[in-house]
Structures are given as structure tokens and as C-alpha cells.
Amino acid sequence: MSQVAFDFGQSEAPRRPKKPERLILMVLLEAPVGSQALEIASEIQTANGIQAKLRPLDHLHISLQHIRDDKRLREKYVFAAKRAANAVVAEAFDVCFDRIVTFPGGRPDRRATVLLGGSTALMDLQCRLGVALISNGLRGALSFNPHITLFYSSRSVVPQQIDPLRFTVRRFSLVHSERGLTKYNILESWLTQAKWH
């Protein structure tokens, strides 16, 4: 007797990591800047014959501190991260991203093609956030490689200079990333102080 498979219109739930709830401090790109970044990504894909899904506009960001991954979001870590960020005061600053590369690590079918760049002020903000996180009992990094992920693909692009993407960082945010669902929840944001000349 044969069995018949029925499709009731229910799609399979996305596969998620064992620790799917990520807590991260980041600079989310404002929409006009993100649109410019996606234009650059599209041009790079066309020039290299790459077909890959671009990162969503509202997910384009510069990671400042990857705090932790958990099976569920823990309020005590959210509280400590907010307290750390509250202790850091920063003035608005400019950044410039003018190189594009594909990171060699990761899964062979999911290598990240990114914009590279930054500024001294960005490095300083990241380091001070790291110190504040550590003093609040959390993991904090004191240095990093500033980048903006554009897309993931099995193909790499040749490292190259591009027309600079310049913008002003006016805020940073604590984000709960629901890994595997492509969903960001902004828990709190901090405005940088206006620049005075």
C-alpha cells in the first residue's frame, strides 16, 4: 500500500543555530547610506558575474561588539550591555569605506563580501565600548576590523579600491539578532553628540 504525501501549505521552519539569540552593539546604516552600499554591491556582482542575495537594507551595519549568543535572550545580559553603553559618550564622527574584499573564512558556499574602511574615531568608540562591557562583566573586544557585509556567496571578488562611501555616524544601537530568521530587534540606541567646529 503506497502512502501519499500531502502538502498543507505549511513551510518548514528555518533552521536555527543551537544558540540563536545574539546580542550585539552595532552602527546601523541610515537608509540613504545603505542604498549607496547596495548600489556598490550590485555593481560588484555584475562585474564579477555573481548572483547572490544582497543583505536587507535595514540590516546593513558595522559590528562594534559581539557580546554573546544564547539559547534565549537573557535580561541580565541586556541590562549589563545597556549599562556599559550608557557609560560611553561619543561625538558624531565621519567614516570612509573604500575597499571591497571577500573574507576567506566561513563556509565555502557562504563567504562574506564586505566593504572595508573606518576611521580613528570608530576604532576609539569600539575600544571604549569593549572596556565598558568588560567592566560590567561581559565579553568585550578592544580592537576589530571595521567592515560592512554586503552579501554572501560561494564566489570571491578580487580585493580592490572603490569610490569611497563616506558618512557620519550619529548613533549606535544594542540589537537582538534572531539568527536564522534574518530579524533584528533594536533594544536601545544611543545618539552621539553633535560635532562643533
Features from the language model and the residues they span:
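Histidine-dependent nucleotide/RNA phosphoesterase domain, centered on the 2H-phosphoesterase fold
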Residues: M1-H197
